[in-house]
């Protein structure tokens, strides 16, 4: 039977991608249905109890700037906040927070259940309704059919998921949850390229069996960072430390002597694992010269005794896991409460997607999260928001939207996936972005909130706060530009006391702030330039904008040159065999990838600058050279 009411957008899956997709579509006013196999696991942290990190924190800030959920949820659930790379430049500084799993899940569910235009329904999906190469709905396991104009697949590791512990394996979407086998089979019938990937998780330890007295503590930062541009530190719950231990030669001997029982090394697992989050088996074998590896013991929550040992993801048998755990300092009597495991699952080649994350072959079908070959909550959330907003726009007969590489880490993520694809779980790093200085955590709202408002993602409260911040920045910069001190002025002595070289000519507040030894905080304690802004976010922007003004202007020039290529569109139906002068290799790669623009084509491995020139000349001769607005 059909459900009596149609929907504009259906989201399948309630993880980090699905929840952001559902919230985005509903915020834009579209009638949205979130289908999940279990309402109680909405927003579940399946692996590590943390949000953020290098590159990842940037994505969280961008999701927040577009009105998303993740940053708000972690501000309510974070039990330790830190700024990584704090001693480095602002481009690579990143926020990271340990999470209380229960509080995080509660924050997500509360937001979902109070979001207008959003209905949540508990049923696993087993089929899609596809008519004339267009998706028009979904079918649940009890045969209930839902109609919609767009469907977003955010199914994580559930598609034909297989869990491995030692040489034993069984079907599962994650520990304790069933896999989605019928939906996997249905998707394999569609004209989509499919592969297998693998990820893993460490055993969880009973905190009562660890001797923390012999371990180093790691505390959070004070003052505490905040993730959301709308948040404040008073929202954070109680803060707790993490602890540090290490593997040792005994640990490594245990691992080496049991590799024949590892499903990875025994050839049982086909899927490729994450390069940047390797199992402890991989670490020991790949870095054979290392006699120890640092392991962070992270609390899973304020009311839980479970500890997440970050750094020993493993699929070795349980008895070997026990030996590994008990070989480390402080863990000699430790007890495992959940075994570690590896999970294999289906993913679909993201090169078959448009930059909006809509399928090139099935109209109205969007993909987001691990199904696209990524790993990580943050990467999933960012894709979910993009897929959700574009599903909403499609259902409202509007053009899709996707950020450029120069606009957001989300743009880098989507361009990498859709242009290059991936053969291993993709993780975001700041090193993947060419324009890091422009794509900082601190300016995510300045880059994206206005766009979010135009798209219908940003509410009135956020918009008012954003405009107030803009006004504070502009007013303060004007004040510093127009406030001067001369070498002969009475205030010069006070200023000179904070400079490595005394004033030799008249200087404005901005001139002084450009000096390496001067900070905004210090400058605004000096009589001519006091008082400081009370808006800390605006104050941070003033300092960064002034100090890096020249570098930012130079990078902006580079971006404008590159945009000419990004905006030169390539016909979706173009057969590159028609273009005389291209090598067979280039023709094959262009026909395989079907890039949307000259910019995308130039990033495909093997497509040379000479080939791009030939292509541009050919397009011009054919009268097909056109640029997007």
From Swiss-Prot:
One Pfam family hit: GIDA
Positions that bind NAD(+): 273-287
Keyword tags: Cytoplasm, FAD, Flavoprotein, NAD, tRNA processing
Subcellular location, record wording: Cytoplasm
Entry GO MF terms: flavin adenine dinucleotide binding
Required co-factors: FAD
Main location as per UniProt: cytoplasm
GO biological process, any: tRNA methylation
Top-rank lineage group of the source organism: Bacteria
Chain segments annotated as coiled-coil in the UniProt record: none
Gene3D superfamilies: FAD/NAD(P)-binding domain (3.50.50.60), GidA associated domain, C-terminal subdomain (1.10.150.570), tRNA uridine 5-carboxymethylaminomethyl modification enzyme MnmG/GidA (1.10.10.1800)
Binding site for FAD: 13-18, 125, 180, 370
One of the record's GO cellular component terms: cytosol
Protein role: NAD-binding protein involved in the addition of a carboxymethylaminomethyl (cmnm) group at the wobble position (U34) of certain tRNAs, forming tRNA-cmnm(5)s(2)U34.
Subunit structure and binding partners: Homodimer. Heterotetramer of two MnmE and two MnmG subunits.
Family per record: Belongs to the MnmG family.
Protein name: tRNA uridine 5-carboxymethylaminomethyl modification enzyme MnmG
Organism: Escherichia coli (strain SMS-3-5 / SECEC)
The encoding gene: mnmG
């Amino acid at each position: 039977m059909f459900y009596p009411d149609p929907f504009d957008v259906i989201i399948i899956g309630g993880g980090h991608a699905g929840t952001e997709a559902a919230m985005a579509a509903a915020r834009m006013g579209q009638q949205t249905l979130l289908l999940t196999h279990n309402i109680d696991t909405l927003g579940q942290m399946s692996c590590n109890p943390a949000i953020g990190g290098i590159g990842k924190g940037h994505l969280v800030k961008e999701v927040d700037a577009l009105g998303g959920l993740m940053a708000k949820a972690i501000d309510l659930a974070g039990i330790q906040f830190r700024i990584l790379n704090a001693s480095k430049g602002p481009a690579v500084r990143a926020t990271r927070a340990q999470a209380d799993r229960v509080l995080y899940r509660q924050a997500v569910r509360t937001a979902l259940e109070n979001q207008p235009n959003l209905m949540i329904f508990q049923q696993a999906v087993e089929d899609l309704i596809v008519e004339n190469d267009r998706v028009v709905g979904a079918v649940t396991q009890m045969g209930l059919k839902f109609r919609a104009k767009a469907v977003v697949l955010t199914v994580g590791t559930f598609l034909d998921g297989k869990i491995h512990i030692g040489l034993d394996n069984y079907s599962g979407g994650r520990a304790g949850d069933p896999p989605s086998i019928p939906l996997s089979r249905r998707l394999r019938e569609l004209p989509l390229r499919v592969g297998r990937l693998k990820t893993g998780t460490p055993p969880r330890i009973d905190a009562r069996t660890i001797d923390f007295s012999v371990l180093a503590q790691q505390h959070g930062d004070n003052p505490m960072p905040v993730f959301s541009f709308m948040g404040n530190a008073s929202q954070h719950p109680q803060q707790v430390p993490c602890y540090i231990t290490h593997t040792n030669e005994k640990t490594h001997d245990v691992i080496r002597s049991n590799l024949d029982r590892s499903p990875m090394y025994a050839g049982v697992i086909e899927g490729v694992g994450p390069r940047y989050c390797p199992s402890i088996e991989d670490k020991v074998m790949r870095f054979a010269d290392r006699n120890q590896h640092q392991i962070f013991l992270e609390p899973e929550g304020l009311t839980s005794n479970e500890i997440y040992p970050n750094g020993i993801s493993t699929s070795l048998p349980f008895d070997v896991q026990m030996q590994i755990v008990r070989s480390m300092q402080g863990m000699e009597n430790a007890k495992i409460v959940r075994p570690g495991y590896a999970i294999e699952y289906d993913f679909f080649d993201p090169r078959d997607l448009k930059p909006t994350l809509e399928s090139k072959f099935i109209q109205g079908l969007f993909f987001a999260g691990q199904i696209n070959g990524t790993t990580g909550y943050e990467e999933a959330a960012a894709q979910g928001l993009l897929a959700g907003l574009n599903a909403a726009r499609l259902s409202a007969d509007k053009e899709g939207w996707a950020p450029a590489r120069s606009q957001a880490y989300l743009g880098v993520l989507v361009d990498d996936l859709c242009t290059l694809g991936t053969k291993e779980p993709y993780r975001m790093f700041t090193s993947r972005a060419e324009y890091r200085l422009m794509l900082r955590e601190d300016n995510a709202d300045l880059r994206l909130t206005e766009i979010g408002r135009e798209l219908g993602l940003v509410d009135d409260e956020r918009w008012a706060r954003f405009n107030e911040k803009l006004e504070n920045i502009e007013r303060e910069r004007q004040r510093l530009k127009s406030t001067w001190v001369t070498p002969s002025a009475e205030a010069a002595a006070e200023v000179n006391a904070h400079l490595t070289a005394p004033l030799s000519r008249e200087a404005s507040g901005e001139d002084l702030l450009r000096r390496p030894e001067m900070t905004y905080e210090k400058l605004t304690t000096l009589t001519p330039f006091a008082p400081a802004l009370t808006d800390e976010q605006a104050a941070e922007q003033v300092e960064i904008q002034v100090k890096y003004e020249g570098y930012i202007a130079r990078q902006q020039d580079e971006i404008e040159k590159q945009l000419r290529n990004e905006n030169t569109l390539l016909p979706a139906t173009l057969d590159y065999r028609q273009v005389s002068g291209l090598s067979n290799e280039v023709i094959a790669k262009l026909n395989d990838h079907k890039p949307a623009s000259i910019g995308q084509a130039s990033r495909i491995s093997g497509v040379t600058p000479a080939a791009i020139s030939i292509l541009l000349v050919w397009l011009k001769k054919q009268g097909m050279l056109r640029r997007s607005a």
